[in-house]
């Protein structure tokens, strides 16, 4: 890879947001340099330089220019490297729908899951119900498709990486049950197919390490 195509990714090993970017880079076969950031301690001068507003990961650096926010980065990669593994449909309506569901995952489902697992106990029942209802909408949207993107992994699948891998880890670490195979058979099957993809599997963080870190940071409901 020549210098003008040099790609760097500033990320965090256990972050589903960072992993979204890595997944797309792997799926498209784009070589990149990965740089681990300590976002909970001393943020590096590079992170402060390339994302001075939010000071968060992930940050993609391409040709010396930086892009922040995981789904923005994913779209940038799609627009820049169009020849391999297309993740957004060409039809404008279908692209808009993909963006809608990706935003739904972030703003509805993921937020509710986090609150259900580690939010105030007084609000847990409400948040579990909200997360459950959000997952039911995704179950319906997935239907009988192999992936949200159809026959191959697409934009919504990448956005939903949290559901495919991290949700089970959150449930194990917190002791809160939201999604079961019996109630969400389509999402369960999708999760297995998604994390079973060789390119996806390659970048997933160790489950045991994530569970231990989450328990240390937040504790579990069953231990309270």
From Swiss-Prot:
Keywords (A to Z) from UniProt: Cytoplasm, Detoxification, Phosphoprotein, Transferase
Role, per record: May be involved in the conjugation of reduced glutathione to a wide number of exogenous and endogenous hydrophobic electrophiles and have a detoxification role against certain herbicides.
Similarity section: Belongs to the GST superfamily. Tau family.
Domain GST N-terminal: 5-85
Ranges of residues in domain GST C-terminal: 91-213
Classification lineage: Eukaryota, Viridiplantae, Streptophyta, Embryophyta, Tracheophyta
Protein's name according to its UniProt entry: Glutathione S-transferase U8
Enzyme Commission designation: 2.5.1.18
Single GO cellular component term: cytoplasm
